[in-house]
Amino acid sequence: MLEEYRKHVAERAAQGIVPKPLDATQMAALVELLKTPPVGEEEFLLDLLINRVPPGVDEAAYVKAGFLAAVAKGDTTSPLVSPEKAIELLGTMQGGYNIHPLIDALDDAKLAPIAAKALSHTLLMFDNFYDVEEKAKAGNEYAKQVMQSWADAEWFLSRPPLAEKITVTVFKVTGETNTDDLSPAPDAWSRPDIPLHAQAMLKNAREGIEPDQPGVVGPIKQIEALQKKGYPLAYVGDVVGTGSSRKSATNSVLWFMGDDIPNVPNKRGGGLCLGGKIAPIFFNTMEDAGALPIEVDVSNLNMGDVIDVYPYKGEVRNHETGELLATFELKTDVLIDEVRAGGRIPLIIGRGLTTKAREALGLPHSDVFRQAKDVAESSRGFSLAQKMVGRACGVKGIRPGAYCEPKMTSVGSQDTTGPMTRDELKDLACLGFSADLVMQSFCHTAAYPKPVDVTTHHTLPDFIMNRGGVSLRPGDGVIHSWLNRMLLPDTVGTGGDSHTRFPIGISFPAGSGLVAFAAATGVMPLDMPESVLVRFKGKMQPGITLRDLVHAIPLYAIKQGLLTVEKKGKKNIFSGRILEIEGLPDLKVEQAFELTDASAERSAAGCTIKLNKEPIVEYLTSNIVLLKWMIAEGYGDRRTLERRIQGMEKWLADPQLLEADADAEYAAVIDIDLADIKEPILCAPNDPDDARLLSDVQGEKIDEVFIGSCMTNIGHFRAAGKLLDNHKGQLPTRLWVAPPTRMDAAQLTEEGYYSVFGKSGARIEIPGCSLCMGNQARVADGATVVSTSTRNFPNRLGTGANVFLASAELAAVAALIGKLPTPEEYQTYVAQVDKTAVDTYRYLNFDQLSQYTEKADGVIFQTAV
């Protein structure tokens, strides 16, 4: 084992990275070596045991905890690990398999003092808290000590407070840094391996950034040169962390700019991030990791500057001269406690433990922790989002600025974040989900899986289902197109993908750490954002699509001065706020998702859309059949699916919807008259905020066209198919087609559209996200593309690609003529589709499709109604 391990260490060192943590097999071999250590290897073996095993409920942690527990009890021995040392080391494992041995040790006079100290600093107790409480009530003095320590928050007060002054060297990335820059999609396979994945951070050359190997390895030498100044680095940018929800982006930044976490291999916390604007999901993942994110004017900060940051005073000064460079206010003073606790999640869990202990001991509420500021009283009404979150918190509504922990009814995870979420769940010692429904998809890696992806496909489903979650299968399709069909109206949820934007209810997408917390505990921390209201009125004009309305939102915000495309001094009224949409109440739920989905591109924290009951009743009636069909097809966890079906049936029995109050307050209101939108609206390369009229970009030569992503539904493919069916000869473009789900693909095949796509020479992808994310399939380098996908960030769909975002209808026309049409040309083409619009824009109602109803009708529930 040692020979193999040292070989691995050497291989990783050649790559410039630390070795992987030990796995269960290596840990089992290490146990045998610890029992009879080879001469001269003692120190090395102990270091492996202490520092190279993941904590929580990792498989290797199970072996480690079992060995240490056996040593503590005297069931086995090691010349290197005494029973006392074994208890001490169990105390470094955070939670999970180490807890019962520590609680048992409270009854051993020799080991109890060490066990008490260890438990006093262990937060992941969950229901094991009551075992300690029971011992304390029975008179165990050491259990009493533990209870008192928790009540006194010694776990928190023993950690160093946030410093008055933090001296750092500036690592500045000008313009906008999105999470794809920090965690590139083609490298998604390596995300759980943080040191390896971090090497790809900023691997594409840009102003001020010098990758070691452009397109492969990021600016490691540049970072190392700055570190030689003797101070930690701070990540600084004009706009930081937009785009996908990748916790891996935070992990990569902190690998270079954070602090080691004692006894936790290959993971770092802490760190400092300064941004003119910091995207909300990235801000949250920084908080969760114990970093200090600060929104501040960074125009006076330059690469390599040494600065002093005063978090309490809200000042940034030049380290040498003391010159004031910028001032700021922390988003909340609770950030100070979050940094001290090692992150927002440890703080929340720890505060809860302290509260529980104080209640058990009959003590008043602790005054140790900073509280979120009280929100000013208001006699005004609540918005729809405020009411939804309020209901999830058991109150009428939640005011902007208030801290709350809403109940998570639905949680989604996908396969490029799922392996990290799995690791986070292990760290949280989670063996069962508390959220009502947790769903795992395999949409980002199904098309062209690497061996590591195949391993994920084989191992992650059982991990999720064993904890009560629902697992999809590779090839099933896009996470959102499935999760939306499992939703309950007016409920709150989250997902490990920035496009988790419920069309009924509301979701606050998050990084994998927060998603794991939400799944494990059934709640999520939230500083309630303000809302921006977008009101549509009037009638849609001929040829105009919902995608044009999606792009009308940034266009009209630009017109009102609420949004700028320029990154320096960026204005974005939507950033960190909730986008609330009214004026389109009769949309089908599938259509409504097109609007809520795109709130991700606005950097909004979440989105609601006001719909009438009828489309929601139709949608849930269809979805009940789909979920029953899933049970018939052997999907699990069956109990979770049955419970969700019962929840849908209960709502349908009395279909009531929340509504915004007429006097609700909004940070801004944007009115859009549909009569004024007379031509398609696109987003120009390479910025989803850069909305343009078709007439402004007409004639642009197009090389490739992509019709697919979570922004599409079956109607879009019928529309494209009808346009393509009229075309004779070869297309002048390369056309990609990827339906969102296997159900869409099956129906399109049955209706003959796959034949049309095939004859047109289209490259038909399996349902999923491959090209949209750009992690597997890619367009040609430097291609000009029209895409129905979500984002057009630089290098996302292809290296150096210029991507226009547009409707499926406009994309199909561009595929046919090899350029962006004039508005008149476009109208000529779409008139062909409009003639059969009723047939084209039909949606998947599973209750009307015999291949689903026949199987659904045979399902007999195994749980009581």
From Swiss-Prot:
Its EC number is 4.2.1.3, 4.2.1.99. It comes from the Bacteria. Its cofactor is [4Fe-4S] cluster. [4Fe-4S] cluster binds at residues 710, 769, 772. Transmembrane segments: none annotated. It is an enzyme of class 4 (lyase). Substrate binds at residues 191, 244-246, 414-416, 498, 791, 796. GO terms for biological process: propionate catabolic process, 2-methylcitrate cycle; tricarboxylic acid cycle. It catalyses: citrate = D-threo-isocitrate; (2S,3R)-3-hydroxybutane-1,2,3-tricarboxylate = 2-methyl-cis-aconitate + H2O. The keyword Iron-sulfur applies. Keywords: 4Fe-4S, Iron, Iron-sulfur, Lyase, Metal-binding, RNA-binding, Tricarboxylic acid cycle. One of its GO terms (molecular function) is 2-methylisocitrate dehydratase activity. Disruption phenotype: Cells lacking this gene do not grow on propionate unless glutamate is added, and the addition of glutamate does not restore growth to the level of wild-type. Also unable to grow on acetate and citrate and only slight improvements are observed when glutamate is added. AcnB mutant also shows an impaired binding to the surface of macrophage-like cells, is less motile and possesses fewer flagella due to a level of the flagellum protein FliC lower. GO terms for cellular component: cytosol. Signal peptide: none annotated. The keyword Coiled coil does not apply. It holds the Pfam family Aconitase_2_N. Binds 1 [4Fe-4S] cluster per subunit. Pathway: Carbohydrate metabolism; tricarboxylic acid cycle; isocitrate from oxaloacetate: step 2/2; Organic acid metabolism; propanoate degradation. Belongs to the aconitase/IPM isomerase family. Monomer. Involved in the catabolism of short chain fatty acids (SCFA) via the tricarboxylic acid (TCA)(acetyl degradation route) and the 2-methylcitrate cycle I (propionate degradation route). Catalyzes the reversible isomerization of citrate to isocitrate via cis-aconitate. Also catalyzes the hydration of 2-methyl-cis-aconitate to yield (2R,3S)-2-methylisocitrate. The apo form of AcnB functions as a RNA-binding regulatory protein which regulates FliC synthesis via interaction with the ftsH transcript to decrease the intracellular levels of FtsH. NCBIfam families: acnB (TIGR00117), PRK09238.1 (NF006690). This is Aconitate hydratase B. It comes from Salmonella typhimurium (strain LT2 / SGSC1412 / ATCC 700720). The lineage of its organism: Bacteria, Pseudomonadati, Pseudomonadota, Gammaproteobacteria, Enterobacterales. The gene is acnB.
